[in-house]
Amino acid sequence: QLFIDNSLKKSELIQVAQLNLAQCDVAKHEMDNRKSTEVNNLGKVVNTSMAEYAPAISLDGGSLYFTSRRPWADDSSEPFRDPRLNNYPEDIYVTNVDSDMSWTSPEKLEFCKSELNEATISVSADERRIYIYNDASGGGDIYYSDFAKNQFEDIKEFTNKGVNSKSWETHCSVTPDGRDLYFVSDRPGGYGGRDIYRIVKLP
């Protein structure tokens, strides 16, 4: 608060400071209203020493799609590893619940490319379409892949007018009936930073 009170009103860091204050308020509230919860690691079958995140679970709970920065088994992703962060590009994997209710060994989705970032966003209610973040354009946009002939097809850019732009679009979620799509963008005209937008499919 001291920084906000004494900084130039045009400072770009004011919004960051205000967000940090709001986060502190949330943290205090949660600490004062603790709930008994148990968090379980999915174990070595799913997790590795590299980063795994952005899980999206199917409606029936039988499939888990997630983003991982693990290296490819054939080492073809090695030339694209970030030497500073020791990160490999993002890829999407899926694991399924087997007959004894444990997770199967994750499989990389067919459309992933070793040199690009493809990250999980969400999965449609019928699990026939997966929405993907892809940075092939340089700015980061929303793509999708449809399930056909027993596999996910090559990704396609989401072409509905008003979604992808020259700005950064990172996430989207579609209602079960497919009518409404909510997405995140840092385009000009919002409240600042990344904002949530909605488009509606017309009859």
How would you name each of these model-derived features?
Residues 2-203:
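Short, conserved micro-motifs composed of acidic
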